[in-house]
From Swiss-Prot:
PROSITE patterns: RUBISCO_LARGE (PS00157). The modification N6,N6,N6-trimethyllysine is found at K5. Its EC number is 4.1.1.39. Its cofactor is Mg(2+). The gene is rbcL. This is Ribulose bisphosphate carboxylase large chain. Belongs to the RuBisCO large chain family. Type I subfamily. It comes from the Eukaryota. The basic functional RuBisCO is composed of a large chain homodimer in a 'head-to-tail' conformation. In form I RuBisCO this homodimer is arranged in a barrel-like tetramer with the small subunits forming a tetrameric 'cap' on each end of the 'barrel'. It is found in: Plastid, Chloroplast. Binds 1 Mg(2+) ion per subunit. Keywords: Calvin cycle, Carbon dioxide fixation, Chloroplast, Disulfide bond, Lyase, Magnesium, Metal-binding, Methylation, Monooxygenase, Oxidoreductase, Photorespiration, Photosynthesis, Plastid.
Amino acid sequence: SVGFKAGVKDYKLTYYTPAYQTKDTDILAAFRVSPQPGVPPEEAGAAVAAESSTGTWTTVWTDGLTSLDRYKGRCYYIEPVAGEENQYIAYVAYPLDLFEEGSVTNMFTSIVGNVFGFKALRALRLEDLRIPTAYVKTFQGPPHGIQVERDKLNKYGRPLLGCTIKPKLGLSAKNYGRAVYECLRGGLDFTKDDENVNSQPFMRWRDRFVFCAEALYKAQAETGEIKGHYLNATAGTCEEMNKRAVFARELGVPIIMHDYLTGGFTANTSLAHYCRDNGLLLHIHRAMHAVIDRQKNHGIHFRVLAKALRMSGGDHIHSGTVVGKLEGEREITLGFVDLLRDDYIEKDRDRGIYFTQDWVSLPGVLPVASGGIHVWHMPALTEIFGDDSVLQFGGGTLGHPWGNAPGGVANRVALEACVQARNEGRDLAREGNEIIREASK
C-alpha cells in the first residue's frame, strides 16, 4: 500500500502551530486576513502560510522526499482586528532557507506572489515584515545613505529642498533646463524630473541630461553651493537604464533617479549597485504605490514597500507629506519614516510597526515629502520630518507669482527661518505662520 493518503485536507492541521517559538532568523509577516463567510480564521491564516511557502491543495507523495517541518511557513498567532468585523491579523513565520540571498524580487514572489488570489479569502493585506539581521546582511542596501549624502553635498543641520519641474510633460529640453537653473539659482538644493519623464518625442533623455547638467553647473558657480537634479534613468529595458546612468556619471552630476515599482526590484537593485560603485546618489520615486497600498484591507502596506526599498537600495524615497494633497496619516507615516532612517526600530502598534526591526549597518534612506505642499506648510514639515528629510515643492516653487527663482528664494528663506526658530526653542506648531511672515519682510 502507498505510504500516504491522497485527498484534500485542512491547512490548519499542518500550518497552524500556535506553540511555535519564532527564531531570530525567521522572516515574520503580519497579514490582515478577511476570510470568506464560514472559513475559520485559523484555517485562513494557515492557508496563507501554506500557499506562500511549501503547501499545495493536496498531499503529494514528493512531500516525503523533504522535511516539511524544516521548510514550511507557520501561522503562529492570530488576533482579531479591533473595530472590524471578520478581520484578523495572522502572524506567519518563514524559515530563512526559503529565500534567495540579496533578492527582494524572490522574497516578494514567495511571500505575496500567489496567495492574494486565494478563494478562501475575501481580502488579504500584508501589513508588515520583520527582516532578520541574517537576511539584511545579504543586501547592499542604499548606495550611500544619509550621512554620506550630507558629506557629498556639504549640507548639514537642516532638511534639503527640492522641486519637481512642471509642467511635467511638454517642455523642450532647453526650456526644461532653464527652469532647473532658475530654481537652483533661487536657493533649492535639488530639482527633479517627474516620474513619467523618461525619453519622449518632445524631449529625449540625452538632450535633457545635457541641458540639466549645464543648468546645474551654472547655478553651482553662481551660488557656491553643490546642486543636484534627479535625472530619471528609468527606461524600458535594464540595458537602456544602465546606459542613462553611465551618461549621467560622465556628465559628473551628483544624483540620478528611478521609479522602483514600475521599473521593478531587479532593475532597481542593479542600479543601486551601479550607483554605489560610481559615486552617484539615487533618488527613488514610488509611482504605482497606491495601486498596491491604498486599500485598507487588501494589498501591501507602504511600510513593507519602504522596507523593501531600503534593502533593494535608494538614497531618497517619497513617503507622503502628512499635510499636502495625498493621503497619509501622521503617526503611521512617521512610523515608516523611522523605518527608513533609523538603525533600530522598536515594535509600536500605535505607529503601525508590528515587529521590532534591526537594520544593523544598512545605510538609511532620506524620506521625501512631496505632493501639494507649499511655503505655509514649512513649519509643520520641519517639525514633523526633522532635519533628515527632503522637502519638495513643485507647484509650490514654480507657482510663485514672480517666477521660479523667487519661488526658490521663498522656500529657502522659509526653511531657514523655521530651522532657526526651532533651534531657538520656539513652538513651530503654534507660531509657524508668524515665523514665516517675519521672514518674508
